[in-house]
């Protein structure tokens, strides 16, 4: 295969918006990571067994109020693209490392994650 020798238009697809049913008795805050649990319901991002990261909440949804039920509310989520998360002790040498769901809206590296809920790759330290 020949080396690239000219500019080309990138084939990039921006993250899309998806709506998910919310798990019972959870409050998802706008701007935090969202996972889907093993029952298929949205929860705040966390290092939970069987969870899958699906994106960032575009709105807050409180499914703890009177009359709450599993799937009783929906949350709109911006699907994977680029997002800013907090990582303790981030360093320039972390660029390119995979990160996994921590708790309280944070991400961690592999050694600090029990269930390896993959969130993405570090592309910038801010």
How would you name each of these model-derived features?
Residues 1-126:
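Surface-exposed, low-hydrophobicity beta-strand/loop segments enriched in small/polar/acidic residues
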């Amino acid at each position: 295969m020949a080396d690239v020798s000219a500019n080309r238009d990138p084939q990039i697809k921006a993250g899309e918006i998806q709506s998910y049913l919310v798990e019972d008795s959870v409050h998802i805050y706008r701007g935090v990571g969202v996972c889907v649990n093993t029952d298929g319901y949205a929860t705040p991002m966390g290092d939970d067994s069987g969870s899958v990261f699906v994106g960032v909440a575009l709105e807050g949804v409180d499914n703890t109020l009177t009359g709450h039920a599993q799937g009783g509310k929906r949350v709109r989520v911006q699907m994977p693209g680029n997002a800013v998360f907090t990582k303790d002790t981030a360093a320039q040498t972390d660029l390119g490392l995979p990160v996994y769901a921590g708790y309280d809206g944070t991400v961690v590296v592999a050694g600090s994650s029990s269930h390896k809920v993959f969130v993405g790759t570090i592309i910038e330290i801010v």
